[in-house]
């Protein structure tokens, strides 16, 4: 008699996950496990960067801070900073109207500086032949009175005379020195002589690398901050052991303080309206701080610190698990690009919870699920290494800081913006393509592992079992739990069971042959009987026609 068939099936894990990923071939594929690699959240605050506070200029501009706008006194001396924060339109800029020459270049310089030390280079009290305290303006008020920038001195004539100035400062420090000075452009000739006595004046400035001669531009202008005059400010970096020489007979705004560059490093000037949040981060954006190990973010293109790369994507999810198709969903799923299972396993097993791939067996001793730990662990290691590799390759830290251009450089600014947008488009495309390709490969990798497990069993059992076409094998012999375990661990003894399997195969084949013979006899009998009946009917019809004279 036939044995009651024992079976072993190969299958894969399924769960209640609703995580979905995209691949080259499909969109919204539900998977058992996935990992988001796009950071989309921030804390909405300005934070310390690696424990170092930012310099938040509040309502002051960089120019207002460096020149010493009286409304920026809180920044007279500042400690080391990690980055500088300036509002888009700070109220306290150049209180006396005018320009800051090469301002954008100075800001770029500041993006590589972390600390200034302010030092006095020409004391205000040293101008004995000129008025050093009368140079104030209602445009720069302080406590309701006229005042002026704290770090420079507006020199006015004294006793109806403005003697020619010849001053030098030698940088004996070991550090570079940021030196600032300026020129006043009066509204008319009357103001020129009223302030400086001399109708024709100049300012000469020289270092080992600088040769500058300035003359005032006297012109009638509209009033700004109540002033028709204008001031123009300049700066230079004075190297150690170099000297800066000033010569002027009027309109000179002399330096009193300079900035010793005591620490250089990665910094940035960030445009933001946020407040300080008393927090710490490794990555700061104008929108807020990011604390993430993900390789990509879509928060803001400008960052400072150890930051993910900015992309324009809204979703980047890597598949780490398998297609999630529980067995109750009997629909055939599309397969991937790189091979994979030929569709013979209709669904995953939610009952197998301790591995990605495994077995289900049934015999006289019962039935149950068992994960294949070895193939599962290899797959976990492989997928984990791949995800970590992607993150490591993409998570090369860098700063993406904004560049500023003056009004004469708008065409350059537009070109720069187009180039940066182009780079962002390329990065976004690369990131999205990478995710699509890797997801396709991961799902096919899992499918291939299931197929390999199936082949491992098939090669062991050979003709001792029958392939049922659904991922299962039906044994031609009794297979108890010990036998089942040997199939799972690859030690199945084919010769031990081959004789029993052969006999059962032959018995099954004999039943098929016997059944086939019976069907053939019945078929012949039926054919003969039908033929005899037809012959009798034809003969009877002929006799009837003859008796009626109808047959000629």
Curated annotation (Swiss-Prot):
The protein's predominant localisation is virion
The UniProt keyword set, sorted, is: Clathrin- and caveolin-independent endocytosis of virus by host, Clathrin-mediated endocytosis of virus by host, Disulfide bond, Fusion of virus membrane with host endosomal membrane, Fusion of virus membrane with host membrane, Glycoprotein, Hemagglutinin, Host cell membrane, Host membrane, Host-virus interaction, Lipoprotein, Membrane, Palmitate, Transmembrane, Transmembrane helix, Viral attachment to host cell, Viral envelope protein, Viral penetration into host cytoplasm, Virion, Virus endocytosis by host, Virus entry into host cell
- For the site Cleavage, which positions are given? 335-336
* Cysteines engaged in disulfide bonds, as pairs: 9-472, 47-279, 60-72, 95-140, 283-307, 479-483
How is this protein positioned relative to the membrane?
Single-pass type I membrane protein
Q: Which residues lie on this side of the membrane: Extracellular?
A: 1-520
Taxonomically, which superkingdom? Answer: Viruses
Q: Spell out where the chain crosses the membrane.
A: 521-541
Q: Which residues lie on this side of the membrane: Cytoplasmic?
A: 542-552
Q: Which GO terms describe its biological process?
A: clathrin-dependent endocytosis of virus by host cell; fusion of virus membrane with host endosome membrane; fusion of virus membrane with host plasma membrane; virion attachment to host cell
The protein's recorded glycosylation sites are 15-16, 28, 170, 291, 489
- A Gene Ontology cellular-component term: membrane
| Molecular function, one GO term | host cell surface receptor binding
Modifications the protein undergoes after translation, according to the UniProt entry: Palmitoylated.
Q: Where is the lipid attached (S-palmitoyl cysteine)?
A: 546
Q: Which SUPFAM superfamilies match?
A: Influenza hemagglutinin (stalk), Viral protein domain
As for subcellular location, the record says:
Virion membrane; Host apical cell membrane
Subunit details: Homotrimer of disulfide-linked HA1-HA2.
Give the record's family classification: Belongs to the influenza viruses hemagglutinin family.
Query: Which function does this protein serve?
Result: Binds to sialic acid-containing receptors on the cell surface, bringing about the attachment of the virus particle to the cell. This attachment induces virion internalization either through clathrin-dependent endocytosis or through clathrin- and caveolin-independent pathway. Plays a major role in the determination of host range restriction and virulence. Class I viral fusion protein. Responsible for penetration of the virus into the cell cytoplasm by mediating the fusion of the membrane of the endocytosed virus particle with the endosomal membrane.
Q: What else is known?
A: Major glycoprotein, comprises over 80% of the envelope proteins present in virus particle.
What is the name attached to this protein's record?
Hemagglutinin
Q: Which gene encodes it?
A: HA
């Amino acid at each position: 008699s036939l044995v009651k068939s024992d079976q072993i099936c190969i299958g894969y894990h399924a769960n209640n996950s609703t995580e979905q990923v995209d691949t080259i071939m499909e969109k919204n594929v539900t998977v058992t496990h996935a990992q988001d690699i796009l950071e989309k959240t921030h804390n909405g605050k300005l934070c310390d960067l690696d424990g170092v506070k930012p310099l938040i200029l509040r309502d002051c501009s960089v120019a207002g801070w460096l020149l010493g706008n009286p409304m920026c006194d809180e920044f007279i001396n500042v400690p080391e900073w990690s980055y500088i924060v300036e509002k888009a339109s700070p109220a306290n800029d150049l209180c006396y109207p005018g320009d800051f020459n090469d301002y954008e270049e100075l800001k770029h310089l500041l993006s590589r500086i972390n600390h200034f030390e302010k030092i006095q280079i020409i004391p205000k009290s040293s101008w004995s032949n000129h008025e050093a305290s009368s140079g104030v303006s209602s445009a720069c008020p302080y406590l309701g009175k006229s005042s002026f920038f704290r770090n420079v001195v507006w020199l006015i004539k004294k006793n109806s005379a403005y003697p020619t100035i010849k001053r030098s400062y030698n940088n004996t420090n070991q550090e570079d020195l940021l030196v600032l000075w300026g020129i006043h452009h009066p509204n008319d000739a009357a103001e020129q002589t009223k302030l400086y006595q001399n109708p024709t004046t100049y300012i000469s400035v020289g270092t080992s690398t600088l040769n500058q001669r300035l003359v005032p531009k006297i012109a009638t202008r509209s009033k700004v901050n109540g002033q028709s005059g204008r001031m123009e400010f300049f700066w230079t970096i004075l190297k150690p052991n170099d000297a800066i020489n000033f010569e002027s007979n009027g309109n000179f705004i002399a330096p009193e303080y300079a900035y010793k560059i005591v620490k250089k490093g990665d910094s940035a000037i960030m445009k933001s309206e946020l407040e300080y949040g008393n927090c710490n981060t490794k990555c700061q954006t104008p929108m807020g701080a990011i604390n993430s190990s993900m390789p990509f973010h879509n928060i803001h293109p400008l960052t400072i610190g150890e930051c993910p790369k900015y992309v324009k994507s809204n979703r980047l999810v890597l598949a780490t698990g398998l297609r999630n198709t529980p067995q109750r969903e009997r629909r055939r799923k599309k397969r991937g690009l790189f091979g994979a299972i030929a569709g013979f396993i209709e669904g995953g097993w939610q009952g197998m919870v301790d591995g990605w791939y495994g077995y289900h067996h049934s015999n006289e001793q019962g039935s149950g699920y068992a994960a294949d730990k070895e193939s599962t662990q290899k797959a976990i290691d492989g997928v984990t290494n791949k995800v970590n590799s992607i993150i490591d390759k993409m998570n090369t830290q860098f700063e993406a800081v904004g560049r500023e251009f003056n009004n004469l450089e708008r065409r350059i600014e537009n070109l720069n913006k187009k180039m940066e947008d182009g780079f962002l488009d390329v990065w976004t495309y690369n990131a999205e393509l990478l995710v699509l390709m890797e997801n396709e490969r991961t799902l096919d990798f899992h499918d291939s592992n299931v197929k390999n497990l199936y082949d491992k069993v098939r090669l062991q059992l050979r003709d001792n079992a029958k392939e049922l076409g659904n991922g299962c094998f039906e044994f031609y012999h009794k297979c108890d739990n010990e036998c089942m375990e040997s199939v799972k661990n690859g030690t199945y003894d084919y010769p031990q069971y081959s004789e029993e399997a052969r006999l059962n195969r032959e018995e099954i084949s004999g039943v098929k042959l016997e059944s086939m013979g019976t069907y053939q006899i019945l078929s012949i009998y039926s054919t003969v009987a039908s033929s005899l009946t037809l012959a009798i009917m034809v003969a009877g019809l002929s006799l009837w026609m003859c008796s009626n004279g109808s047959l000629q």
